From Swiss-Prot:
Xref: InterPro entries: ATP-grasp, ATP_grasp_subdomain_1, IMP_biosynth_PurP, IMP_biosynth_PurP_C, IMP_biosynth_PurP_N, PreATP-grasp_dom_sf
Coiled-coil zones: none
Reaction(s) catalysed by this chain's protein: 5-amino-1-(5-phospho-beta-D-ribosyl)imidazole-4-carboxamide + formate + ATP = 5-formamido-1-(5-phospho-D-ribosyl)imidazole-4-carboxamide + ADP + phosphate
Alphabetical UniProt keywords: ATP-binding, Ligase, Magnesium, Manganese, Metal-binding, Nucleotide-binding, Purine biosynthesis
Cofactor mode of binding and number, as noted: Binds 1 Mg(2+) or Mn(2+) ion per subunit.
Record-given protein name: 5-formaminoimidazole-4-carboxamide-1-(beta)-D-ribofuranosyl 5'-monophosphate synthetase
Binding annotation for 5-amino-1-(5-phospho-beta-D-ribosyl)imidazole-4-carboxamide: H27, S94, N258
Keyword NAD: no
Residues where Mg(2+) binds: Q297, E310
Obligatory cofactor(s): Mg(2+); Mn(2+)
EC number per UniProt: 6.3.4.23
Keyword Oxidoreductase: no
Residues where ATP binds: 146-208, 230
Length: 361
């Protein structure tokens, strides 16, 4: 693991007057880059030429770093170019997937906003479950083997895959039947199946809660809440029940979009309590803990209990649903505030206070 001291020593060689905010052109890069520009930073996007159009049309990037493949982002030549432009990387789900956790931990030496150590804790289900459970959050019951399935469960797989390959089932036989279907489609591999995470199926409404923890202010902020459009399950529910049976469609849960939601105000104390507990425990277990944006993906059951089924330890894709601010983020200052701009504000404040060591790794 690259040490924080090594990253900070690289940052010390930067021209602090010419910091460039950089991310990979995907996931949440539009409002990351736009937010940085609104706070006066220079911006750059790492992209392939065939995917540069949105960033040019929206005008969010000052510079373009072209790669043949996104996996090239950890190449020494690209890293050297980033360091020369005084880059601070904002990691998101696609960046982590393309770079790879091992590379990120051991080879990628460009200063990043947040805590790179905690990214493995969101990717590996056992570590994620341990952190959520020890934080005192309600999580779905985990089954250790397909042989234990005797009730409705949800089957998930490691990494940031946007729900691809997830499926529900109720018996061991149904588990293996669906596994074979997804393997035939090229969606799952034997390695995926060996790492399957099987958990209790919680019936409830979906709330993906987006927080920001400021180590400079020692404050957990609620930035917004979204829910997801998932294919093909959201299409299936529009088909009459009798036709669903005849069509015999296997549901999938691939996230194809997000929409903003608000939660009952009486549930907000529970929402803040969950964020506070996770931040406190993360600092204890994976120092320096949650830095900046994170997300708790939850289901609210009919007892109005929020059950957390997943976490993101970095900016989550659902923040795209409030690029011009959310019903919650605007309450802090009365101005529209995206998660991307909130990140940029934290970096700007850290520069002013000479406290970049609190937010970089």
């Amino acid at each position: 693991m690259i040490s924080k001291e090594e990253i900070l020593s690289i940052y010390e060689g930067y021209n602090k007057e010419e910091i460039t905010i950089v991310t990979v052109g995907s996931h949440t890069s539009l409002h990351i880059l736009k937010g940085a520009k609104l706070e006066g930073f220079s911006t750059a996007v790492i992209t392939t030429k065939d995917r540069a159009t949105p960033y040019k049309r929206f005008g969010v990037a000052d510079k373009y770093i072209y790669v043949d493949n996104f996996s090239d982002i950890s190449n020494e030549e690209i890293q050297k170019q980033l360091i020369e432009m005084n880059a601070i990387i904002i990691p998101h789900g696609s960046f982590i997937a393309y770079c790879g956790l091992d590379n990120l931990e051991n080879n990628f030496k460009v200063p990043m906003f947040g805590n790179r150590q905690i990214l493995r804790w969101e990717a590996e289900r056992d570590l994620e479950g341990k952190l959520l459970k020890e934080s005192g959050l309600r999580i779905p019951k985990k089954l250790n083997s397909p042989d234990e399935i005797n009730c409705p469960v949800m089957v998930k797989f490691p990494g940031a895959r946007g729900g691809r390959g997830y499926f529900p089932c109720s018996t061991t036989e149904e588990f293996w039947k669906k596994v074979e279907i997804f393997k035939e489609r090229g969606i799952l591999t034997d390695e995926d199946v060996g790492n399957a995470h099987i958990e209790e199926y919680v019936v409830g409404t979906n709330y993906c809660i987006h927080y920001f923890y400021s180590p400079l202010k020692n404050q957990v902020e609620l930035m917004g809440i979204d829910s997801r459009y998932e294919s093909n399950i959201d299409g299936i529910v529009r088909v009459p029940a009798k036709d669903q049976m005849e069509l015999d469609i296997n549901p999938s849960y691939v996230i194809s979009g997000n929409f903003p939601v608000v939660i009952r105000e009486s549930l907000l104390p529970q929402v803040f309590d969950m964020g506070d507990k996770l931040v406190a425990k993360a600092e204890e277990m994976v120092a320096p803990g949650m830095i900046g944006p994170f997300c708790l993906q939850s289901l609210c059951n009919d007892s109005l209990e929020l059950v957390v089924f997943e976490m993101s330890a970095r900016i989550d894709g659902g923040t795209n649903s409030f690029m011009n601010g959310s019903a919650y983020s605007c309450l802090y200052s009365g101005e529209p505030l995206s998660m991307g701009q909130r990140i940029a504000k934290e970096i700007k404040l850290a520069l002013e206070l000479d406290m970049m060591d609190k937010i970089l790794y």
